[in-house]
């Protein structure tokens, strides 16, 4: 049945994209006079083409194939970095060619890899602007295109192997080509132009030169970076700063994960890690990690290290950086308070390279971020520890899930989780269906149930395509007793999916699952009786507006 439904939706997508492009071609608007912009460009010594690396596209993306042994598929390599020149496209903004980069990502539905292409430009948003981007196929013949999220209201015109779209505001724009094929995605990040010299000078005036560490454009290699008990510290990665993690330990099987210990690591983090994260902050206050640089962990083996980790920290600000191909959990906030994350992008193809994991933290905002990873993308957890998870808000974020879940409460609920918001965000694709009682696009899934969940809002979220469940609320631990999931609200949610959304408790009537549905739309049409769209299990209180 699911295969038939998928066929129908695939046919519907193909037909609608084709007809829309044929019958209602997009309008290309006049550009602003003297439109001024700059673009992200990485140093030549960091970025090489596939040809220069002696690789074909198939050889590179084949490294992510699930047909390989797990620790080979997610292993590291050093013959090419995690960002390369995209072989798929060239791009122009206002007639000027801009770099198109690419990183390996994972497609779960086919258990294989592909390249996700991207560019980034900087504009002055204090002035009205309009520009046209032209994307021309190189290895890919372009026949039609759709621009996501649909809420941007941007349409694409395809003619003679070139796609053109008019853009007039900052944001993250993802182009799907050839009947919304997820193999050849391209994302344009349009972000605010900044004066790096001015920003750095202001930080030096505020904190002193010794407390402002600047990495200029260039390549930097570290075994790991360990920062303990720092206060009022700024780490500034200028545009084009390329930070590489050195591979030290061969992790070829699960036994190897515990084979290599770094003796002082356990005392320098609060999460129980026996090897340092690649960038580790512990017991720090008023910390800023920012700039248009990249943190690339492609050389590390599976689970050799975690990515960027903050534990027991206060007043944390992270902005503008890109995190590439972490071997495990890309970004972690654990037992932290007052955390701001803005304009951070995470791309990765390995299993367990979760995107943004906010754990046991208070007063956290995640805004304007993009993640395409082979695991959970934007998640809240409550692990063991003294703190619960409270007052955490995600806004204007874009998720592309190549394996598991996109937005929500995922797995560990060992303390109370409360006052969580996911708003004004979008799912491009989510294609994992390996356990449809555990994964989905928007989820509240409790696998460990020592705590409780009270107050989760999903609002104004669009899901372009989900191969499984678009919404899942589930007590996954069937042995749970006296566990509460309450005050969960789904408001103004639109989706297209191959399975029904689901809300389910357990056989025990001691557990509570309470959900409100308010404004649910499928395939672009708001439904009058949203409860009828859902599979609803035992001991669930579901209301609808």
Residue ranges and their predicted role:
Residues 13-21, 235:
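Hydrophobic core
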Residues 165-167, 220-234, 244-288, 298-315, ...:
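Extracellular beta-strand-rich solenoid/capping regions of secreted or surface-exposed proteins
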Residues 232-234, 239, 285-296, 314-325, ...:
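Right-handed parallel beta-helix
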């Amino acid at each position: 049945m699911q295969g038939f439904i998928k066929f129908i939706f695939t046919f519907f997508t193909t037909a609608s994209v084709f007809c829309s492009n044929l019958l209602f071609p997009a309008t290309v608007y006049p550009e602003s006079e003297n439109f001024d912009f700059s673009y992200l460009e990485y140093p030549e010594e960091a970025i090489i083409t596939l040809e220069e690396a002696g690789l074909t596209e198939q050889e590179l993306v084949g490294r992510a194939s699930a047909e390989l042994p797990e620790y080979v598929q997610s292993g590291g390599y050093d013959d090419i970095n995690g960002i390369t020149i995209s072989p798929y496209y060239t791009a122009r903004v206002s007639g000027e060619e801009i770099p198109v980069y690419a990183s390996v990502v994972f497609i779960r539905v086919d258990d294989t890899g592909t390249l996700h292409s991207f560019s980034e430009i900087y504009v002055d948003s204090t002035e009205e602007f309009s520009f046209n981007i032209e994307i021309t196929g190189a290895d890919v013949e372009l026949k039609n295109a759709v621009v996501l999220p649909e809420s941007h209201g941007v349409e694409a015109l395809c003619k003679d192997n070139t796609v053109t779209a008019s853009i007039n505001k900052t944001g993250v724009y993802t182009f799907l080509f050839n009947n919304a094929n997820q193999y050849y995605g391209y994302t344009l990040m349009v972000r605010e132009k900044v004066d790096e010299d001015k920003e750095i000078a202001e930080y030096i005036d505020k904190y002193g030169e010794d407390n402002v560490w600047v990495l200029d454009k260039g390549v930097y290699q570290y075994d790991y970076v360990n920062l303990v008990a720092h206060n009022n510290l700024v780490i500034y990665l200028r545009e084009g700063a390329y930070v590489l993690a050195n591979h030290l330990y061969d992790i070829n099987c699960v036994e190897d994960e515990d084979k290599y210990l770094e003796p002082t690591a356990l005392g320098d983090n609060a999460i129980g890690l026996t090897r340092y994260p690649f960038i580790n902050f512990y017991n720090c206050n008023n910390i800023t990690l920012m700039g248009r640089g990249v943190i690339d962990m492609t050389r590390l083996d599976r689970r050799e290290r975690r990515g960027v980790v903050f534990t027991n920290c206060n007043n944390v600000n992270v902005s503008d950086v890109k995190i590439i191909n972490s071997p495990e959990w890309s970004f972690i906030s654990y037992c932290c308070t007052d955390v701001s994350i803005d304009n951070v992008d995470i791309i990765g193809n390995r299993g367990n390279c979760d995107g943004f994991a906010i754990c046991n933290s208070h007063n956290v905002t995640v805004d304007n971020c993009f993640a395409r990873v082979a695991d959970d993308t934007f998640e809240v957890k409550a692990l063991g520890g003294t703190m619960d998870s409270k007052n955490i808000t995600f806004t204007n974020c874009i998720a592309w899930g190549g394996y598991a879940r996109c937005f929500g409460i995922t797995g560990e609920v060992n303390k109370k989780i409360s006052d969580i918001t996911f708003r004004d965000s979008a799912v491009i694709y989510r294609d994992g269906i390996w356990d449809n009682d555990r994964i989905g696009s928007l989820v509240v899934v409790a696998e460990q149930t020592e705590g409780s969940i009270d107050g989760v809002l999903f609002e104004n979220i669009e899901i372009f395509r989900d191969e499984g469940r678009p919404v899942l609320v589930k007590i996954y631990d069937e042995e749970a007793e006296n566990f509460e999931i309450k005050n969960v609200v789904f408001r103004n949610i639109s989706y297209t999916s191959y399975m029904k959304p689901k809300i389910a408790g357990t056989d025990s009537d001691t557990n509570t699952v309470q959900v409100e549905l308010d404004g649910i739309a499928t395939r672009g049409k708001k439904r009058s009786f949203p409860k009828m769209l859902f599979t609803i299990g035992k001991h669930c209180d579901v209301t609808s507006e």
